[in-house]
């Protein structure tokens, strides 16, 4: 039926989230759901590989999700750009632009999952790229084993994910 001069058809819509190897573009795992399911809901059903680093965009920043991600598989880590309004306190300064941080867990998150506690920890790094300071947050706490420039370079591979669709 025309509506405002346009024809509309009923079409099923779905939301998908995939775990992709950025080197090979191979889809490792995928979840498909209705559009009323959020990306975090679908992503929490993915199975990360052991001894892996998953690159997320900022939409996946959630204490409950990221803590859970690390528990899904042995040495399953994550790396993402830090939000501009990130609330944290410095636990340890590894270098001028590399920090072990502690972040408060929101009241809402604690209500949904009381096992989370009051705080969670991660690593915050700052890297200058094209004249701008970029901040990244990661579960890879060991600054000697995972140098900050190597992590920033690794995150640049996140755009390879877009080549899979």
Show where each model-derived region lies.
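Single, function-defining residue in the core of a domain
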Residues: 3-165
């Amino acid at each position: 039926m025309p509506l405002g001069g346009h024809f509309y058809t009923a079409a099923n819509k779905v939301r998908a989230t995939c775990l992709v190897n950025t080197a090979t573009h191979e889809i490792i795992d995928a979840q498909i759901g209705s559009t009323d399911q959020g990306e975090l809901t679908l992503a929490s059903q993915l199975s990360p590989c052991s001894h892996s680093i998953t690159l997320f965009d900022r939409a996946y920043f959630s204490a409950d999700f990221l803590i859970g991600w690390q528990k899904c598989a042995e040495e399953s880590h994550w790396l993402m750009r830090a939000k501009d309004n990130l609330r944290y306190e410095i636990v340890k300064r590894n270098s001028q632009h590399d920090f072990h941080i502690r972040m408060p867990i929101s009241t809402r998150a604690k209500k949904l999952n009381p096992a989370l506690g009051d705080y969670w920890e991660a690593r915050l790094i700052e890297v200058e790229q094209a004249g701008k300071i970029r901040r990244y947050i990661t579960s890879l706490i060991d600054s000697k084993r995972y140098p900050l420039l190597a992590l920033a370079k690794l995150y640049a591979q996140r755009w390879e994910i877009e080549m899979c669709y």
